[in-house]
């Protein structure tokens, strides 16, 4: 409305308008004077204004001065007093009324308490400090809404961060994606999982069967060991009735004979009995016993060589020392005579090469189970030799024919 049209108003209308304005200003001033509580959160109108501010910030343009003044007039407790006071000053009709001056100072205080926090390119939001009485308290700091990709802060409304647009996706942590990938890769297909379960079941059954077989083997070994013991005792009694049986079996064995020299064969002729005892039901060791009769070489009646497992699980051997008679120590004599390859009886005191001990292997696995076959070799050899030396029947040549005289 122009100034000319305003001048044409009647004095009654002017007075009525001034009275209404003064009443409104007086009521607003009294309400603002007695209200000591901090302003409440903006209403629906404030949300729309903030949304307009955010839209302007997104476009990157400067905010018009008219929108800024309108936003300032939309604050609570203002009720348009600042705009009306400015209009009255422009018209030159504002009188030095104490109520109007009080309202103007209140509007200036509200305007000074309102601060604008800008973002890149435009004003983002209104930041308002809290008031307690006449003292101003610093406002609450808006939370930082920077994303992981380094974008600028998002505009907020009423101190709450605005959600990002639907086109922008939050970056998922790389560690979580890697863990999920490894989890799915290690799970395997259902067929593989089923095969593994079946394989474990079969393996458990095999282990159970092996344990049962071991127990059954120990029971059978104990049972048949007692039966064998009876027959072994009977065999030993029969062998003792045959002089020189074991000495002849040692000499006739194709492998053991390589460890014997001439003196060893003489000593073994006094061997009356040989025993191989198994240590434990699982054959954890052996004890070999040589029973000798009275002889001119040593005083021992029994020579023992024992094999077993030590505390660390390693195979160890033990033997009783041979008590040689003076001048008949075959070990010392074999060292003095370089032609001899060593004495068989040096095996009793040798505990270094247990794993490569061929003598104990031959005795346990070959000679002891069936010594008769090696004793009979000499009988067969003597029989064949006797057949070769025995002369055959002489063939008679026919007598020459005698011619009769005529």
Curated annotation (Swiss-Prot):
Record's function text: Involved in modulation of cell growth and cellular response to gamma radiation probably via regulation of the Akt signaling pathway. Involved in regulation of p53/TP53. Suppresses p53/TP53 protein levels and promotes its ubiquitination; the function is dependent on USP7 and independent on MDM2. Proposed to displace p53/TP53 from interaction with USP7.
Subunit structure: Interacts with USP7.
Gene Ontology annotations for the cellular component aspect, listed alphabetically: nucleus
Region Disordered: start-end pairs: 1-67, 132-164, 382-406
PANTHER family listed in its UniProt record: TESTIS-SPECIFIC Y-ENCODED PROTEIN
GO biological process terms on file: cellular response to gamma radiation; nucleosome assembly; positive regulation of cell population proliferation; positive regulation of phosphatidylinositol 3-kinase/protein kinase B signal transduction; positive regulation of protein ubiquitination
Highest taxon listed in the record's lineage: Eukaryota
The protein's name in its UniProt record: Testis-specific Y-encoded-like protein 5
Pfam families xrefs: NAP
Basic and acidic residues composition bias: residue spans: 27-38, 382-392
Family: Belongs to the nucleosome assembly protein (NAP) family.
Record keywords, A-Z: Growth regulation
Bias (Low complexity): 49-62
Disulfide bonds: none
InterPro entries registered for this protein in UniProt: NAP-like_sf, NAP_family
Bias (Basic residues): 1-25
SUPFAM superfamilies according to UniProt: NAP-like
């Amino acid at each position: 409305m122009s100034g000319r049209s305003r001048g044409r108003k009647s004095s009654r209308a002017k007075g009525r308008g001034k009275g209404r304005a003064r009443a409104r200003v007086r009521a607003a001033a009294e309400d603002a004077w007695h209200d000591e509580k901090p302003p409440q959160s903006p209403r629906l109108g404030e949300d729309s204004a903030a949304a307009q501010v955010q839209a302007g910030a997104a476009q990157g343009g400067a905010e018009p001065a008219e929108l800024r003044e309108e936003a300032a007039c939309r604050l609570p407790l203002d009720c348009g007093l600042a705009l009306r006071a400015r209009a009255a000053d422009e018209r030159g009709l504002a009188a030095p009324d104490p109520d109007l001056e009080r309202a103007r100072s209140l509007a200036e205080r509200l305007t000074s308490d309102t601060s604008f926090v800008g973002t890149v390119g435009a004003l983002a939001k209104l930041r308002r400090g809290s008031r307690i009485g006449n003292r101003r308290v610093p406002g609450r700091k808006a939370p930082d809404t920077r994303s992981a990709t380094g974008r600028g802060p998002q505009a907020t409304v009423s101190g709450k961060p605005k959600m990002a647009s639907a086109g922008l996706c939050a970056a998922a942590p790389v560690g979580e994606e890697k863990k999920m990938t490894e989890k799915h890769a290690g799970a395997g297909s259902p067929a593989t999982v089923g095969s593994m379960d079946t394989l474990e079941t079969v393996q458990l059954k095999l282990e159970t069967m092996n344990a049962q077989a071991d127990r059954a083997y120990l029971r059978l070994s104990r049972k048949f060991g007692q039966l064998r013991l009876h027959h072994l005792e009977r065999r030993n009694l029969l062998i003792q009735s045959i002089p020189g049986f074991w000495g002849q079996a040692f000499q006739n064995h194709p492998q053991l004979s390589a460890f014997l020299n001439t003196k060893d064969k003489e000593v073994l002729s006094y061997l009356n009995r040989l025993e191989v005892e198994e240590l434990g039901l699982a054959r954890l060791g052996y004890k070999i016993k040589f029973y000798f009769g009275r002889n001119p070489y040593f005083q021992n009646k029994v020579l023992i060589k024992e094999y077993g497992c030590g505390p660390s699980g390693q195979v160890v051997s033990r033997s009783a020392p041979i008590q040689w008679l003076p001048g008949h120590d075959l070990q010392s004599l074999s060292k003095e005579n370089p032609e001899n390859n060593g004495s068989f009886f040096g095996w009793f005191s040798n505990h270094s090469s247990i794993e490569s001990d061929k003598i104990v292997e031959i005795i346990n696995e070959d000679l002891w189970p069936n010594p008769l076959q090696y004793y009979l070799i000499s009988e067969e050899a003597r029989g064949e030799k006797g057949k070769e030396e025995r002369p055959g029947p002489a063939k008679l040549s026919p007598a020459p024919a005698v011619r009769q005289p005529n």
